[in-house]
Amino acid sequence: MKKLLPCTALVMCAGMACAQAEEKNDWHFNIGAMYEIENVEGYGEDMDGLAEPSVYFNAANGPWRIALAYYQEGPVDYSAGKRGTWFDRPELEVHYQFLENDDFSFGLTGGFRNYGYHYVDEPGKDTANMQRWKIAPDWDVKLTDDLRFNGWLSMYKFANDLNTTGYADTRVETETGLQYTFNETVALRVNYYLERGFNMDDSRNNGEFSTQEIRAYLLLTLGNHSVTPYTRIGLDRWSNWDWQDDIEREGHDFNRVGLF
């Protein structure tokens, strides 16, 4: 597997928000842009890093939320002024909140994403155009005054040019667990996370993988400010992304600590 050692620098982030309010039509909008650079070691291409520009637009009205985004990613040799294999990723998501109160909340998201790959110096590959369809329910349930059960489940279907891009045709991703509130300042959330790529077509073996983690968050609220230390503990992780050269699954072990 290719090994990445990212050192991420946010070099540009711009955003603006506006609201248009009418008596029966209350729309809220925000729009922004970001340019992200990652230093990459051992990527397999003689490049300095990854370039990841993106722009986004969000709109909300009552129970509806609409999100549009455009993202691009690919390795770049900045000194030579050239890039390696890269892709475009326009995306649309629509979320509807069916129910929302202190006892129970339930919403549903539908989405579409297109991957436009542009291969550079890869024999037998020129371009690929792959689509991903998404449906994702989310929930929040009050068990007691201090204990809640919440989470989300995303189900994806990939189509077109999968043998070129190396993706599996189906994927599920979920994070769900319990949150206990000790007081107005401290709360603890412990979740189970799973992401699994697999093929519904038994004749296919490309792009299969599995990641299982325990994710713990310590939510600290200090007046108008909040900070959340977190950790991710790997339970099981393997992948089959090198399926064209080696169909054996490769194991991994990644843990993480962080702050946001």
Q: What is the meaning of each model-derived region?
A:
Residues 63-68, 101-108, 145-151, 180, ...:
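Repeated loop/turn-to-beta-strand initiation elements of outer-membrane beta-barrel proteins
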Residues 27, 47-53, 84-90, 127-135, ...:
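Residues that define the transmembrane beta-barrel architecture of outer-membrane proteins
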Residues 192-260:
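Predominantly the C-terminal beta-signal and adjacent terminal strand-loop region
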Residues 33-35, 55-61, 92-96, 135-141, ...:
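Residues on the lipid-exposed face of transmembrane beta-strands in outer-membrane beta-barrel proteins
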Residues 1-30:
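Cleavable N-terminal export/targeting peptides
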Residues 35-41, 61-63, 70-76, 98, ...:
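Transmembrane beta-strands of outer-membrane beta-barrel pores
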Residues 39-47, 74-85, 116-130, 159-169, ...:
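Flexible, solvent-exposed loop segments that connect beta-strands
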Residues 20-80:
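Short glycine/proline- and aromatic-enriched beta-strand/turn motifs that initiate or cap beta-hairpins
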